[in-house]
Amino acid sequence: MKIRASVRKICEKCRLIRRRKRLLVICYNPRHKQKQG
């Protein structure tokens, strides 16, 4: 899980999700997981 100021999709299968007022990126590839900090 990477914590970044700006999250973005890395590949086609990445999905942007808003949970508890935080943006998350989830993907089948665990390297693409991101959270906005």
Swiss-Prot record:
A cellular component annotation (GO) from this entry: ribosome
Transmembrane segments: none
Keywords assigned: Chloroplast, Plastid, Ribonucleoprotein, Ribosomal protein
A Gene Ontology molecular function term of the record: structural constituent of ribosome
Biological-process GO terms, alphabetical: translation
UniProt-annotated location(s): Plastid, Chloroplast
Domain of life: Eukaryota
HAMAP family registered for this protein in UniProt: Ribosomal_bL36 (MF_00251)
Family: Belongs to the bacterial ribosomal protein bL36 family.
NCBIfam families documented for this protein: rpmJ_bact (TIGR01022)
Name of the featured protein: Large ribosomal subunit protein bL36c
Organism: Cryptomeria japonica (Japanese cedar)
Gene: rpl36
